[in-house]
Every structure is written in C-alpha cells, then in structure tokens.
C-alpha cells in the first residue's frame, strides 16, 4: 500500500506539467535585469529625441 501512495506523489498533475517544464527552460536562457532593460529603453528614447531635434 505505501508503494502505490508513493507513486501517486511522484507523478505530477497534468495541469502542473507545463509549469514545471517552463521553469526548467527558464534556467537555460540569458537573464537580464529589469533595471538594465528600463535603462536601455530610456537611453534609446533620449538618443532618438536628440537626433530628431538636431535634424
């Protein structure tokens, strides 16, 4: 009886399988800090505004 209970606990629920798979894939990608993304977008915006004012 305990072995069947153990098997039920180790098998993931079908609705959770996608979340677990997504979490595993996330570790393989390059991580960029949100501060860097915001800073880069602000810098690009300022550069575009300055260039349009000059020309």
Curated annotation (Swiss-Prot):
Residue spans, topological domain Cytoplasmic: 1-33
Membrane topology: Single-pass membrane protein
GO terms for cellular component: plasma membrane
Extracellular side: 54-55
Transmembrane segments: 34-53
Key word Transcription present: no
Family classification: Belongs to the SEC61-beta family.
Functional note: Involved in protein export. The function of the beta subunit is unknown, but it may be involved in stabilization of the trimeric complex.
Family matches, as NCBIfam families: PRK01253.1
Quaternary structure annotation from Swiss-Prot or TrEMBL: Component of the protein translocase complex. Heterotrimer consisting of alpha (SecY), beta (SecG) and gamma (SecE) subunits. Can form oligomers of the heterotrimer.
Name recorded for this polypeptide: Preprotein translocase subunit SecG
């Amino acid at each position: 009886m305990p072995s069947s209970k153990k098997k039920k606990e180790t098998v993931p629920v079908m609705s959770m399988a996608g979340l677990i798979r997504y979490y595993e894939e996330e570790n393989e990608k390059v991580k960029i800090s949100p501060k860097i993304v915001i800073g880069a977008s602000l810098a690009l915006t300022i550069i575009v505004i300055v260039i349009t004012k000059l020309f």
